[in-house]
């Protein structure tokens, strides 16, 4: 032996990895016994050195990292920058959170890296450093929290808390930081998400499923096996689950011979040792191994299918309870890993992406056509390359080539100068980590008005849900303000109040018998004030400078429409006026869009709800006179008449008709299935057949229509037994009016219908009196539409007439299905279109479309009749209400207040802002929303525009702005009005230039403005409006209202359509409180002669430069511009990326706490055990995690068609079902194993296979081929079903099923085990009623009754083996010369003797002297 002094001395620090390598080399070189001795000496040496050193921790040993201060300040600075970008709308909430997480995580990791070098340089013998590095106490992560910073914390759900803990445990935590720390680490009462009891309950359920599984035999002789490829091959083949690692092969038993070329290296039923596994790893052929999944019986398991015992590294012994071991091995890791306090205390850890940095300075060049723009996960602009991108970096020295991998993000542009070590790209990870889509709602915690800068998609994400998705990145603004409720007597406008033009709601009135006539009012003393468009037409005074009067489209008067989700028709409201009463009423008429109308054809129909019925019956005409009409003339454009096959009859003279109620049912069931007889009397809700229940009581009348069809009529009413039968029978089947008498003692007060009938048994005639419904058609309903008295007499007007139609013939039966009302009478409208136009059209077709006007980013929609060649695009709209009042001239007219609850909640309204001026001569621009703009979705892409179209037609004006005097006739240029009101010429010149610049800007963007809803492009966008003002106030397109004059004026604005027709739209104000709660004043002169950076209505963000060095200190919208300051309505801006789901539309009101938008984003799935345990439970309980797609049925049918070709066997469905179940078992095992492996816990696959085998060991008896063996839906053991199919001539049908742990525990063969688990009373009662027998095969039921458990030495197999050994010893001791024959030896070893008196298929154990209750018959 060498002298100790001659041995080499290694003075090196040995960490855990080096110690593992040392122990491995010792085992290989010296064996296990010598290695154990050496390690004991190392242990003794370590304790001696530690005792001599006497290392302990003190408060002075906890020294902080010197660089900690500036690293934390740098992270806080990055947080301030992200917060500023978030307020400006450059980032949304998710991107801000990601930036914060990345910044603080990078700071924390930098501190962790700096900690070890700091200790080595400053104090290498620091006890904290030595203990953490050696692993004696704590880890690097724990020391980092003690001396560096606590960092980011993760909540119990795995989500990162965005508020980092800047301090460490040495300095101490604040109250807020302590709460966050406890919430992440789940200490004490904060631990409410995951408890140890959850893991304990999981273990209990697992044990309940497999507690009866034990090793009973040596070999079950199954031909089945599992095929795997070794992990060294690195490939996956069709038909195999995947690869098998080296550790997975050790302890298994081969199911087939393994050959190396032609030499057999392993045989069947040979267990795989470590050396054999190493040899098999080099094989490229699939390896077939035995598995608990392939064992024949589900009540026990054999030695070869189980393999090695993990404790002894040898084949498992007979009688070992492997089921309980499997359940505990799966549930125990969850119990140990539930509390993260023992590890890192909930500290968040993540991975920083891999970046590509430039090696030296130079210019970057690459092909930009191979890139497409995108955003990084932090909100920075980037470009993604679809394929590998070649990149060239050049400088004065030379050019270097580089290749950027595909799907990488580039942070630079071509031709950009980059510096050394600058990040130019972010490389995508090679292995995609598991992600989950999360939808985060955004709560702005502010109130105000919503404004969208872009439009959204309307998509259908499910059958009954229509979602709105943002089609591209855009901003959403919340402009400050709050609505206010006025009482009905308040009508004064306040400063900064919002003025709204909205129709008054119309309540549904039952009585609609008023006539339609021309209102008796004089135009000289009444002013007609309406909500909506009042006058559209071509008046000669508006076209004095036109060389040729244009042919126009025209818009129907008194029509207000709203966008809705209807498919074809829109609703139109027409005026009705009650006679002798100055009150207007309206009726709803359906109009078909995207359709044409010929001359004198029906344009629309009105369905009065008074002439609707929800009761089936028979129509009987009374005094009404009708006239048949040609059905071809009734091709209703509104979409109502052309869908009905019933003939219509025109009403010529007023009168009445009746509906005799009755219920009619047609059944094809046999007479034996009808539960009532003819002429029987039933109550409401009586059962007629198995599928028919009466809705009302009455008399049953049945009639056989054919061999298999019977008509059942239920006639409601009263049965009368008359004394004078002859007189009554003469008056049968008649209608009796009120006042008539049936007999001396019965007088009729309402209309009734008499029907006599005879009872066969009594032979007597009775009378059924049925109350009927009367419908009156008065002359008012036949009146014509009133003429428009407010139009000039010289102007041509459209003539319209109304026709009433009855939709049923006399004696026709009306059938109501599903309580859907049936219309009996319709009022139709016919308009003579040709007489309304100013010139003859080349064709006699008119098309209906919508004009949608975008007013202040909101929409108003009107019905338009287009004499166009092709029909316009179809749009769905819904009607809003119209209201009109007549006010005498000379009296102030209070504005209508928005108090009523409109039935159309999403009505779109024109709005304006009221501003009061203190000085009459003050010039002030204020935002007024009477400007129209085109929807981007239907934008005309042609360059150029006609922003000054209207101005050119009006006296050659160029800038399109007008100032109207009080006479409302003189039109002058805005520049003249400005020069009259401004005393300072410099200011005047600046204002004129600013206004002209704004006008030119509108002309350059003409494709974005104009009318919306017509097929042809819009050519003009300038929409002036005029106001009647007093004093010297200025009125422009962005005008204001001065209420100093107590005078009621009318306001108009003009539209121009695609045919250059000028349309006059008089409107009125509708008041609601303004939204400027806290306006922001900018005391800066933002105008100059050179440039004006802001304009009315401009949305400005925080810190935006307005003029030179002056910035806006708060976001908002410019509402007014003064020569010395501007008025900004404060607001907040939020960024919404593509795919976001907005919950509010533009113009809606947002209250505090409302959800603004929902942002989707991808998040890495947490690998924490707290999220893994619910995942394991979800898998083992067989819960559905996602809905099945709608097309799965078609895919399954295609798969069934090709399954025969794939398998090539007429039993393909049976084989396919078995193969699918095997694949399902392997997937379950793989998913559960991955959850535990994510936490570093490895569970033996054999234990998982035992659990999964029990979950899939049962089948469900199906209804096809029902026999007397099993009931449909009954759970049956798979082996039992297979045995019965081998015995029966007619096989039973069953389907495979995957049971959950709980259901499998309650579906065993032992009712004692089920009752001891849960639902004790129900299980025992059910077992008693069925007379179930418990054969006491499992461990639990034997423990319950106090008997010995059938495992270990109590196992029958072990007991039999002991008896055989005793018998052998006794025979050898007695010295018997007779030797056992081979047959007797085999019989003795098996423990059975053959009896001639019994059936040879039964073998009774003779050696066991036990009671009959413990007799074990091996029948499986």
Curated annotation (Swiss-Prot):
Zn(2+) binds at residues 220, 295, 302, 305. Its main location: plastid. Keywords: Chloroplast, DNA-directed RNA polymerase, Metal-binding, Nucleotidyltransferase, Plastid, Transcription, Transferase, Zinc. The keyword Protease does not apply. Pfam families: RNA_pol_Rpb1_4 (PF05000), RNA_pol_Rpb1_5 (PF04998). The keyword Zinc applies. InterPro entries: DNA-dir_RpoC2_beta_pp, RNA_pol_beta''_euk, RNA_pol_Rpb1_3_sf, RNA_pol_Rpb1_4, RNA_pol_Rpb1_5, Rpb1_funnel_sf. Binds 1 Zn(2+) ion per subunit. It catalyses: RNA(n) + a ribonucleoside 5'-triphosphate = RNA(n+1) + diphosphate. Its cofactor is Zn(2+). GO terms for cellular component: chloroplast; DNA-directed RNA polymerase complex; mitochondrion. GO terms for biological process: DNA-templated transcription. It comes from the Eukaryota. It is found in: Plastid, Chloroplast. One of its GO terms (molecular function) is zinc ion binding. Its EC number is 2.7.7.6. Belongs to the RNA polymerase beta' chain family. RpoC2 subfamily. DNA-dependent RNA polymerase catalyzes the transcription of DNA into RNA using the four ribonucleoside triphosphates as substrates. In plastids the minimal PEP RNA polymerase catalytic core is composed of four subunits: alpha, beta, beta', and beta''. When a (nuclear-encoded) sigma factor is associated with the core the holoenzyme is formed, which can initiate transcription. HAMAP family: RNApol_bact_RpoC2 (MF_01324). This is DNA-directed RNA polymerase subunit beta''. It comes from Adiantum capillus-veneris (Maidenhair fern). The lineage of its organism: Eukaryota, Viridiplantae, Streptophyta, Embryophyta, Tracheophyta. The gene is rpoC2.
């Amino acid at each position: 032996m060498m002298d100790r002094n001659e041995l080499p001395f290694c003075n090196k620090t040995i960490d855990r990895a080096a110690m593992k390598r040392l122990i491995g080399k010792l085992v290989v070189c010296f064996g296990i016994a010598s290695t154990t001795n050496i390690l004991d000496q190392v242990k003794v040496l370590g304790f001696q050195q530690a005792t001599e050193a006497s290392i302990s921790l003190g408060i002075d040993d906890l020294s902080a990292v010197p660089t900690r201060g500036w690293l934390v300040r740098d992270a806080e600075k990055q947080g301030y920058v992200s917060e500023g970008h978030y307020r400006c709308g450059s980032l949304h909430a998710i991107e801000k959170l990601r930036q914060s997480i990345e910044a603080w995580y990078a700071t924390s990791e930098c501190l962790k890296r700096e900690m070890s070098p700091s200790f080595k340089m400053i104090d290498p013998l620091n006890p904290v450093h030595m203990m953490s590095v050696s692993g004696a106490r704590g880890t690097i992560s724990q020391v980092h929290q003690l001396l560096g910073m606590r960092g980011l914390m993760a909540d119990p759900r795995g989500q990162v808390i965005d508020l980092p803990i800047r301090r460490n445990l040495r300095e101490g935590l604040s109250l807020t930081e302590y709460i966050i720390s406890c919430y992440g680490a789940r200490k004490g009462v904060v631990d409410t998400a995951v408890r140890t009891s959850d893991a304990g309950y999981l273990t209990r359920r697992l044990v309940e499923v497999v507690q009866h599984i034990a090793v009973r035999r040596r070999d079950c002789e199954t031909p089945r096996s599992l095929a795997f490829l070794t992990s060294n091959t690195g490939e996956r083949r069709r038909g195999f689950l995947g690869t098998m690692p080296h550790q997975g092969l050790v302890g298994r038993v081969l199911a087939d011979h393994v050959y190396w070329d032609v030499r057999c290296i392993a045989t069947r039923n040979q267990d795989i040792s470590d050396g054999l596994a190493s040899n098999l790893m080099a094989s490229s052929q699939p390896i077939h191994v035995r598995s608990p999944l392939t064992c024949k019986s589900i009540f026990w398991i054999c030695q070869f299918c189980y393999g090695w015992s993990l404790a002894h590294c040898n084949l498992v012994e007979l009688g070992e309870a492997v089921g309980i071991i499997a359940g505990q091995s799966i549930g125990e890791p969850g119990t140990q890993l539930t509390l993260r306090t023992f590890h890192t205390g909930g500290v968040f850890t993540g991975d920083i992406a891999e970046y590509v940095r430039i090696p030296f300075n130079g210019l970057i060049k690459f092909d930009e056509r191979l890139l497409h723009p995108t955003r990084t996960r932090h909100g920075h602009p980037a470009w993604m390359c679809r394929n590998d991108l070649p990149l060239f970096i050049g400088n004065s020295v030379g050019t270097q080539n580089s290749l950027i991998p595909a799907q990488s993000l580039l942070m630079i542009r071509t031709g950009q100068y980059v510096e050394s070590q600058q990040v130019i790209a972010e490389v995508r990870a090679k292995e995609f980590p598991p992600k989950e889509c999360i939808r985060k709602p955004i709560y702005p915690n502010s109130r105000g008005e919503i404004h969208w800068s872009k439009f959204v998609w309307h998509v259908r994400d499910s059958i009954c849900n229509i979602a709105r998705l943002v089609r591209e990145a855009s901003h959403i603004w919340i402009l400050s303000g709050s609505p206010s409720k006025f009482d009905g007597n308040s009508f004064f406008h306040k400063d900064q109040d919002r003025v709204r033009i909205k129709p008054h709601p119309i309540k549904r009135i039952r009585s609609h018998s008023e006539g339609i006539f021309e209102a008796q009012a004089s135009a000289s003393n009444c002013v007609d004030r309406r909500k909506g468009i009042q006058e559209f037409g071509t008046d000669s005074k508006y076209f004095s400078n036109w060389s040729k009067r244009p042919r126009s489209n025209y818009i129907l008067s008194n029509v207000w429409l709203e966008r809705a989700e209807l498919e074809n028709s829109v609703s139109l409201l027409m005026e009705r006026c009650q006679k002798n009463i100055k009150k207007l009423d309206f009726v709803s008429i359906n109009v078909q869009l995207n359709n044409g109308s010929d001359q004198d054809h029906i344009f629309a129909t009105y369905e009065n709800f008074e002439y609707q019925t929800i009761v089936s019956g028979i129509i009987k005409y009374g005094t009404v006179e009708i006239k048949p009409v040609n059905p071809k003339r009734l091709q209703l454009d509104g979409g109502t008449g052309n869908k009905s096959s019933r003939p219509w009859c025109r009403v010529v003279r007023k009168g009445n008709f009746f509906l005799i109620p009755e219920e009619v049912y047609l059944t094809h069931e046999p007479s034996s299935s009808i539960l009532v007889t003819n002429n029987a009397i039933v109550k409401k809700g009586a059962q007629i057949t198995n599928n028919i229940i009466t809705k009302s009581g009455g008399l049953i009348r049945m009639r056989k229509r054919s061999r298999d069809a019977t008509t059942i009529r239920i006639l409601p009413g009263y049965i009368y037994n008359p004394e004078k039968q002859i007189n009554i029978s003469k008056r049968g089947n008649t209608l009796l009016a009120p006042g008539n008498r049936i007999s001396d003692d019965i007088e009729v007060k309402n209309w009734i219908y008499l029907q006599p009938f005879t009872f066969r048994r009594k032979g007597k005639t009775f009378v059924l009196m049925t109350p009927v419904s009367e419908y009156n058609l008065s002359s008012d309903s036949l009146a014509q539409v009133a003429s428009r008295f407010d139009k000039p007499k010289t102007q041509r007007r459209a003539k319209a007439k109304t026709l009433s139609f009855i939709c049923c013939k006399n004696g026709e039966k009306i059938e109501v299905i599903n309580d859907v009302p049936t219309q009996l009478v319709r009022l139709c409208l016919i308009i003579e279109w040709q007489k309304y136009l100013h010139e003859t059209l080349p064709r006699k077709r008119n098309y209906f479309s919508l004009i949608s006007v975008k007013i202040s980013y909101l929409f108003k929609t009107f019905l338009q009749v287009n004499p166009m060649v092709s029909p316009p695009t179809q749009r769905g709209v819904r009607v809003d209400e119209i209201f009109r009042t007549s006010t005498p001239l000379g009296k102030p007219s209070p504005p209508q207040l928005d108090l009523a609850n409109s039935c159309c909640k999403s009505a779109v309204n024109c709005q304006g802002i009221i501003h009061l001026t203190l000085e009459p001569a003050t010039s002030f621009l204020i935002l007024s929303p009477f400007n129209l703009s085109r929807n981007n979705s239907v934008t005309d892409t042609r360059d150029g525009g006609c922003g000054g179209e209207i101005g050119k037609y009006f006296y050659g004006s160029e800038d399109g702005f007008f100032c109207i005097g009080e006479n409302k006739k003189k039109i002058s240029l805005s520049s003249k009005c400005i020069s009259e009101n401004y005393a300072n010429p410099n200011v005047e010149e600046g204002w004129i230039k600013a206004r002209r610049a704004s006008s030119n800007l509108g002309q350059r963007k003409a494709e974005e403005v104009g009318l919306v809803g017509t097929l042809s492009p819009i050519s003009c966008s300038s929409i002036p409006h005029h106001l009647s003002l007093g004093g010297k106030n200025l009125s422009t397109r962005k005008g204001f209202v001065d209420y100093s004059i107590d005078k009621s004026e009318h306001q108009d604005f003009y539209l121009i359509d695609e045919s250059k027709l000028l349309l006059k739209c008089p409107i009125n104000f509708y008041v609601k409180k303004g939204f400027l709660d806290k306006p922001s004043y900018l005391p800066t002169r933002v105008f100059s002669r050179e440039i004006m950076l802001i304009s009315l209505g401009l949305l400005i963000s925080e810190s935006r430069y307005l003029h030179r060095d002056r910035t806006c200190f708060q976001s908002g919208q410019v509402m007014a511009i003064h020569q010395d300051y501007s008025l900004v309505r404060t607001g907040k801006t939020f960024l919404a990326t593509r795919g976001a789901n907005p919950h509010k539309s533009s113009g809606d009101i947002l209250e505090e706490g409302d959800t603004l938008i929902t942002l989707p984003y991808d998040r890495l799935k947490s690998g924490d055990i707290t999220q893994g345990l619910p995942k394991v439970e979800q898998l083992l309980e067989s819960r559905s995690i996602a809905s099945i797609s709608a097309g799965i049925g078609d895919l399954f049918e295609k798969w069934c068609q090709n399954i025969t070709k794939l398998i090539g066997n007429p039993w393909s469905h049976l084989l396919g079902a078995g193969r699918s179940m095997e694949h399902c078992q392997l997937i379950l095992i793989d998913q559960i194993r991955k959850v535990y492996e994510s936490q570093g816990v490895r569970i033996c696959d054999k234990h998982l296979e035992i659990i999964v085998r029990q979950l899939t060991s049962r089948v469900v008896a199906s209804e096809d081929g029902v026999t007397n063996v099993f009931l449909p839906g009954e759970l049956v053991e798979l082996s039992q079903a297979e045995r019965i199919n081998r015995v029966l001539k007619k096989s039973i049908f069953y389907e495979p099923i995957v049971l959950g742990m709980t259901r499998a525990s309650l579906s065993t063969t032992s009712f004692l085990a089920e009752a001891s688990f849960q639902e004790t009373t129900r299980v025992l009662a059910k077992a008693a009623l069925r007379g179930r027998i418990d054969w006491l095969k499992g461990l639990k039921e034997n423990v319950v009754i106090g008997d010995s458990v059938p495992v270990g030495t109590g196992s029958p197999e072990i007991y039999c083996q002991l008896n055989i050994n005793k018998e052998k010893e006794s025979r050898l001791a007695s010295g018997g010369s007779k030797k056992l024959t081979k047959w007797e030896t085999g019989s003795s070893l098996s423990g059975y003797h053959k009896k001639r008196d019994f059936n040879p298929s039964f073998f009774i154990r003779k050696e066991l002297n036990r009671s009959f209750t413990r007799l074990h018959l091996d029948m499986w």
